[in-house]
Amino acid sequence: MKVRPSVKPICEKCKIIKRGGRVMVICENPKHKQKQG
């Protein structure tokens, strides 16, 4: 899980979702998981 000021999809399987008011990227590749913070 990476915490960054701006989250962007890295590959075509990355999905941007909102969880509890936080923007996150979920993906099949665990290296692509990101959280905004």
From Swiss-Prot:
| GO MF, any single term | structural constituent of ribosome
Entry's Gene Ontology BP terms = translation
Single GO cellular component term? ribonucleoprotein complex
**Keywords from the named record:** Ribonucleoprotein, Ribosomal protein
What the entry lists under Pfam families is as follows: Ribosomal_L36
- Entries under InterPro entries matching the protein: Ribosomal_bL36, Ribosomal_bL36_sp
Family assignment from sequence similarity: Belongs to the bacterial ribosomal protein bL36 family.
Quote the HAMAP family the UniProt record gives.
Answer: Ribosomal_bL36
Its recorded name reads Large ribosomal subunit protein bL36
Q: Which organism is it from?
A: Alkaliphilus oremlandii (strain OhILAs) (Clostridium oremlandii (strain OhILAs))
| This protein's encoding gene | rpmJ
